[in-house]
Amino acid sequence: MIKGIGIDITEIERVKKAATAHSQFIQHVLTPTELEQYSQFSGQRSVEYLAGRWSLKESFAKAYGTGIGANLGFHDIEIIDNQYGAPIVTKSPYNGNAHASVSHTATLVMTEVILESENK
């Protein structure tokens, strides 16, 4: 059974500006494992990855029902690409299944997270 759906659209340039303006922005958003994956990219692809993780975590927080804040932080959620590049939620406070999807244009990233209970 679906427990929550979260959708987010983020401007890639906005995330790029935040990362440039705030020296700890990337470390604030990405877990150490996500940072490892991020470090494998360069140029526009690294910005897309960062914006994608920001947006995926926002989508997760919306599906979870709390938003990002006092009860749920960016490091409480970890989303790693599998060998095919699909985002997989590897860490979260949610005990059921979490399904994630991400898509980019040249300027935007759109994400969706669906939280599903283990009992169908």
Curated annotation (Swiss-Prot):
Note whether Phosphoprotein occurs among the keywords.
no
- The residues forming a coiled coil are none
Q: In the record, what terms sit under GO molecular function?
A: holo-[acyl-carrier-protein] synthase activity; magnesium ion binding
EC annotation from Swiss-Prot or TrEMBL: 2.7.8.7
User: Broadest EC class?
Assistant: transferase
Q: Where in the cell is it found?
A: Cytoplasm
Q: Which reaction does it catalyse?
A: apo-[ACP] + CoA = holo-[ACP] + adenosine 3',5'-bisphosphate + H(+)
- Protease as a keyword of this entry, yes or no, is no
Residues annotated to bind Mg(2+)? D8, E58
* Cofactor dependence: Mg(2+)
Keywords assigned by UniProt, alphabetized? Cytoplasm, Fatty acid biosynthesis, Fatty acid metabolism, Lipid biosynthesis, Lipid metabolism, Magnesium, Metal-binding, Transferase
| A Gene Ontology BP annotation from the UniProt entry | fatty acid biosynthetic process
Query: Where is it found, in Gene Ontology cellular component terms?
Result: cytosol
InterPro entries found in the cross-reference section: 4-PPantetheinyl_Trfase_dom, 4-PPantetheinyl_Trfase_dom_sf, ACPS, P-Pant_transferase_sf, Ppantetheine-prot_Trfase_dom
User: Per the similarity annotation, which family is this?
Assistant: Belongs to the P-Pant transferase superfamily. AcpS family.
Q: Which NCBIfam families match?
A: acpS (TIGR00516), pantethn_trn (TIGR00556)
Question: According to its UniProt entry, what is the function of this protein?
Answer: Transfers the 4'-phosphopantetheine moiety from coenzyme A to a Ser of acyl-carrier-protein.
- Matching HAMAP family, A to Z? AcpS
Could you identify this protein by its name?
Answer: Holo-[acyl-carrier-protein] synthase
